[in-house]
Amino acid sequence: MGYRILTLNQISVRGLERFPRDRYEVASSLAHPDAILLRSADLHSVEIAPSVLAVGRAGAGTNNVPVAALSKRGVPVFNAPGANSNAVKELVIASLFLAARNICQAWDFARGLSGDDKTIDEATEKGKKSFAGFELPGRTLGVIGLGAIGVEVANAAERLGMRVIGYDPDITVQRAWQLSASIEQARSLDELFSRSQFVTVHIPLVEGTRGLVNSTRLQLMPE
């Protein structure tokens, strides 16, 4: 008899192909599953069947999984740290460009133009300076959490010419070796916020990190 795997989210076909059908039954609706595979579904709010022997999350964080409760039951929780690090890095860098160069506002402005070519040209010349923004080289990015994602973000921003400050009191030796030597270390969160024009956070949302970014710390950031 094969193992029964309950999927609670859409999982990549390439990932599911790793479970041969002659040994595994994989479905989004199963009674008495041996394992649960999920992405963003919140396991805190559902009853986990006594038959479950393992839980796997297709992602890095496990804040949507009751790890402590499952550990007491002897149920291991597996995750995939770093699996989405490049995708997240690209989105963070894209967000920096969006914020610095007023791209969304310029897009809305351009879509709102109407009239003949002469009218549009005149409106463009008159309005385009409002969206110039500023360039990223020389600006400071604070990175909170230097795991797989944080390190990639920090290194990418540094290659863009940004000054990068990192904060992670629990950084591993492996991640430290991967980090560019030019990345500066912040001794505290308050120091990081007070020196950064942009801040990006790459740590799990748990009770110990909830409220880490707050109005008091945001007010420390330079104008």
Specify the residue positions occupied by each region the protein language model found:
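Phosphate-binding beta-alpha-beta segment of Rossmann-like dinucleotide-binding domains, i.e.
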Residues: P81-T140
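Glycine-rich Rossmann-fold phosphate-binding loop(s) that bind the pyrophosphate
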Residues: L146-G147
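Conserved S-adenosyl-L-methionine
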Residues: R159-R163
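Gly/Ala-rich phosphate-binding loop of Rossmann-like dinucleotide-binding domains
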Residues: A154, E158
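Structural/interface elements that position substrates and couple domains in central-metabolism enzymes
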Residues: Y3-L6, Q10-R14, R21-V26, S85-A87, ...
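An N-terminal-biased, well-structured beta-alpha scaffold segment characteristic
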Residues: M1-A80, S194, N214
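N-terminal Rossmann-fold NAD(P) dinucleotide-binding loop
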Residues: G150-V151
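Rossmann-like adenosine-cofactor binding region
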Residues: H44-V46, P169-E223
